[in-house]
Amino acid sequence: MVVGQLVDELILHANRDNTIRHYYDIALVGYSGDEVYSLLGDEIAFHPITMLAEQEVPRIAYTLSHKTINGDTHNILNEVSMWAKPAAQGATPMYKMICSVTNLVEEWCSRSENRDSFPPLVFNITDGEASDAGYDMLRSAAHRLQSIGTTDGKTLFVNIHISSDTNHTPIIFPNLNEVPLAIHHAHLLMDMSSIMPESLHPYIVECRSWFASPPYIAMSYNASMSELVAMLNIGSRSLTIGQ
C-alpha cells in the first residue's frame, strides 16, 4: 500500500492541465526469497511516469487517521493503487537488491539527458532484516549507492521500516540522537541512510511532530500511515525544488 501511495502522489504531481508530464522516471523493484525482480512485469528498468499513469491498476480503500492540534481524531477514507503486494514470507535479499538498484541508478545518471537532473531518490520499504549480508556489507553497499549522482547532488537513499511492534516510539527523519540504537535494525538503517540536504529541511520540520535540530537522517521506523504519506511526498517536493 505504501508503494501505491508513492506512485499515486507522483502521478498527481506530474499532472499539469490534465496532462501527465514526463517529470519522473520510476523503477519498482521487489525482493523476497532469493530473487530481486521488477514489479512492473518486465526487466528491472526505469519507466517514465507517463507510462505508469496509463496502466490500469486495482485500487483498494483504506482509512487514514489524522490528529488535530486539539487532540481530535478524524478518519479519512482514501483509495490507493495496488502496484505491489507485501512479501513477508521467506528470505529478504536486501544486499542483492541494493546492488541491483545501484547498477540501475548508475546507468541512469550516466545518460547525458540526466546529467544535470535532480539526483535519484531510492525508497527502501522493508518489514524485516536482510538475510543475505551482514552489517558491514549492507552499509558498504548503501554508501556506494549514495556515491552515485548528477551535477545537482548525490543519490538519496531513504529507508522505511514498517512494523506492527508498538513498543518503540515511531520516528520519521530523526536526527542522530533520536535513533533507538538498542534496536539493531534501526541502527543498521541509520547507517545505511542518507543525510537529508538542507534544501529539504523546511519540509522535514513540517513532517515531524516535534522540533529537533538537523542533520536529519533519511529513514523512518514504525511510522504511521499519515507520517509515511508525508515522508513519501519528499519526492514531489524534490521536483518543486529542482524546477
Regions found by a protein language model. Give the residues of each.
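Acidic, low-complexity intrinsically disordered regions
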Residues: 1-243
